[in-house]
């Protein structure tokens, strides 16, 4: 797939621009292109394309990332798609891309102090952009509710509070059947509405109990460890970058949803 990197990256940028013109808005972000039968989210394509492009460029640099020129060259390829995703605005997807890029810089041997500065800069950016309009009200609510779920358990903190109750109700072996009886084939939950979205782990804890949650986390651990092994065994820089980028993506996604 290395030979298609430029085309893949360029195409993803075109799609990110296109979605700002003709895209439809879902959950406050204009990030989807309606193709009739299915909908396409260009940001998902851009995440993989960006990691591929950075891997290709890092390979051309022979892995030498600790120069000002090389550092900012790689950064440009990450900033372009990130900026287009921020405009949608989709801060969640931007965060995912950030951690994937951070993984590439890490595997590239970037000075660890620079990585720490990058994390600090991200936190500072959130503070500075808090009232800029780029961070939507619902995103602010999710952040504040996560930090203190007991602030408003009837509104902003409701889902998080209910998810904890649901997990606790599962006990060791689980509480009740996993699927609803309304003919939709959807998940059932006595405590969390729309549990199949960001609170799927609460569903596992409620339906399958502690044992089910442990099994799921064990599978995640095996998946991540295998992906890291693949990254270590990659014969070129491009392969390592793509592999570790995907490790970063899965790790962040798993952490975010648990």
Whereabouts are the PLM-identified features?
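Hydrophobic alpha-helical transmembrane segments of multi-pass inner membrane proteins, especially
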Residues: 1-161, 202-258
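Extracytosolic (periplasmic/ER-lumenal) interhelical loops and adjacent juxtamembrane/interface segments
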Residues: 159-176
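Membrane-helix/interface signature in polytopic inner-membrane proteins
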Residues: 167, 181-182, 229
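Long extracytoplasmic/lumenal interhelical loops at the membrane interface
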Residues: 172-208
């Amino acid at each position: 797939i290395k030979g298609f990197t430029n085309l893949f990256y360029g195409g993803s940028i075109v799609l990110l621009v296109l979605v700002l013109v003709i895209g439809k808005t879902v959950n406050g972000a204009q990030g989807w292109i309606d193709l009739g039968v299915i909908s396409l989210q260009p940001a998902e394509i851009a995440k993989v394309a960006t990691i591929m492009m950075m891997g290709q460029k890092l390979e051309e640099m022979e892995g030498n990332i600790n120069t000002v020129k090389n550092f900012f060259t790689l950064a440009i390829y990450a900033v372009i798609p990130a900026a287009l995703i921020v405009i949608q605005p989709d801060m969640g997807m931007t965060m995912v891309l950030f951690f994937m890029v951070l993984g590439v810089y890490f595997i590239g041997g970037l000075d660890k102090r620079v990585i720490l500065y990058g994390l600090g800069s991200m936190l500072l950016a959130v503070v500075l952009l808090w009232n800029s309009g780029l961070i939507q009200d619902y995103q602010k609510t999710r952040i504040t509710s996560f930090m203190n779920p007991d602030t408003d358990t009837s509104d902003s903190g409701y889902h998080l509070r209910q998810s904890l109750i649901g997990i606790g109700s599962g006990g060791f072996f689980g509480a009740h059947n996993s699927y609803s009886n309304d003919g939709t084939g959807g998940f059932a939950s006595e405590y969390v509405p729309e549990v199949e979205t960001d609170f799927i782990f609460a569903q596992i804890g409620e339906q399958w109990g502690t044992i089910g949650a442990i099994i799921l986390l064990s599978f995640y651990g095996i998946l991540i460890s295998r992906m890291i092994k693949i990254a270590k065994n990659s014969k070129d820089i491009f392969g390592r970058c793509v592999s570790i980028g995907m490790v970063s993506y899965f790790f962040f996604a798993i952490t975010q949803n648990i």
